[in-house]
Amino acid sequence: MKTSDIQIRDPYIYADQQEKMYYMFGTTDKNCWRGPGQGFDCYKSKDLQEWEGPIPAFRPSDQFWGKENFWAPEVHHFNGQFYMFATFIAEQRYRATQILTAPNVFGPYVPLTDEPITPDNWQCLDGTLHVDESGDPWLVFCHEWVQIHNGSVYAMRLSHDLKRAVERPYFLFHASEAPWVKQTGWPEPGGKYHFPTYVTDGPFLHRLTDGTLLMLWSSIGNKGYAMGVCRSESGHILGPWQQLPDPIWAEDGGHGMIFQTFAGQLMLTFHSPNRTPDERAVFVAIEEKNGRVQLQA
């Protein structure tokens, strides 16, 4: 099947150098907004155009705590093992990031621990793995705007088996710090309970060849869902983080990540449009220039 045939949000590519195979993960439930979560599917391709699948990468057991909103799986290889970071929620539970594990890239994945890795009593989503220059793993995640109104991004250092946090979460930035981010329409402006809200979605870390540490993340801009970039002034995950003034993708697309093709081309993938059921994976060539990434001319 072609890329245009696959309904997917939050696409994530694991490029397997040995197999020369691209594995695509993402939010694959037909209606990811309500109803019981079905799981996550995986697709594989040699050329990012024709895909085999779906391959069931994760299906929940009856005992799994997450019941709805199966969102944004990412797959990372760390310490010889494959790990999936994904978002779930359930009635009387907070939205959270759960880490899962498998012996191979396409699964099937099972929960690494009984409970999620993000803080108790926080509405969290879109956890990603960052390994710093000392080899220490960090969870970078969003503290969701639905709880705190001005969505934020945090980093939390993990144990090397990824089973627990070893330090408190560190605040990195609020959504409203980026000049391109606009206030959302929720709650409705002018309504009885109106207050300003700002979204943070989909953080992803990328280190340039010159050592600069960048973060992709998504929010609402002038033309709807959009994706921006910020830069760590220290080169470390704890920043401070400088928001670049303009989004890298400004209209009806976001929740992206960066990978390198087997031919050496740097690629940005994200979903667009942002409406269900029309969302599809988009692949755009990018380049490093002047301490940032930009769309390739």
Write out the residue ranges for each language-model feature:
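Carbohydrate-active catalytic/glycan-binding domains of CAZyme proteins
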Residues: M1-A297
